[in-house]
Amino acid sequence: MFAGLADSTLSRDDGYRFMVLGRAIERVDMTVRLLLSRVGDSGSSPAWVTLLRSAGAHDTYLRTYRGALDAGRVVEFMLLDRLFPRSIFYSLRLAEHSLDELLNRPHSRLGATAEAQRLLGRARSELEFLQPGALLESLDGRLAGLQKTCRDVGEALALQYFHSAPWVAWTDAGHGEGVVIEEGEV
């Protein structure tokens, strides 16, 4: 409900772009977690149907693959489909686009200038140019790498846009030992 209301009423300013960017990164992370939960399952396990339903992808998958349920195709669909909004590839591309708009450089002559932009582009291109048939090889490692990318992108965005101020905490050291000053960053 919130997503529909936000999409239909919010101005397309930086706040909206941050919301879309965050939602896309979170969608990548959650889809990776869904896939990681099924990596060890057999190809004919009914758990793959559950995975598709959990992602709201069951009907679209059935239309795309004409009803043939296969673990390899489910993984391919959830990772690489360019038209399904909850696939990892689609979400990475959406996150890249949102970040380009935030940087006010959608058609820059230079490549990635921000760390988050570089990380998103690398993750997307690794999926996009994956060798045919290599998708299921070391799937758990590839998914763990995507999860790490989501975490790294979040940290890069925090450093780039949300500057933290150093904090000072005064604590009583106890029984006549003086005052201790602790410093760090929020």
What are these model-derived regions, one by one?
Residues 1-186:
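Alpha-helical transmembrane segments and their helix-helix packing motifs
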